[in-house]
Regions:
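Non-catalytic C-terminal accessory/binding modules of secreted extracellular proteins
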Residues: 1-113
């Protein structure tokens, strides 16, 4: 499944200008009992879909604003975007988030399936 949230520049996101965070959530129950068991899961149980590249997955970054979706960075998340909304088995989910607005406390986007 997918989870979308507006990560405005408050709290843990206070050092970023904000944007839409899109999280890929593994649908099936997993038995991970310790931190290392959960971190080593493949595919990940919860994974931030990075709007610009995969450097979080490669441990090259601790996070930055361009990992979030917003107009002026990456404003489309669908089956053919990079990253894409395909399921873990690479089949089409049919889910898309498009026309993502500029980052801010209030953001708009179009979600379709």
């Amino acid at each position: 499944g997918l989870l979308l949230d507006n990560s405005s520049s408050y709290g843990v996101w206070s050092s970023y200008s904000g944007g839409a965070a899109i999280w890929h959530i593994k649908d099936i129950h997993s038995s991970c009992y310790g931190y290392n068991d959960c971190v080593a899961q493949s595919p990940k149980l919860v994974d931030l879909e990075e709007a610009n590249d995969g450097d979080l997955d490669n441990a090259l970054s601790n996070g930055r604003t361009t990992h979030l979706f917003y107009s002026g960075n990456s404003a489309t998340f669908d089956n053919s975007s990079t990253p894409n909304s395909k399921l873990y088995d690479n089949s089409f989910s049919g889910i898309s988030a498009t026309s993502i607005s500029a980052a801010g406390d209030n953001m708009t986007l179009t979600i379709s399936k």
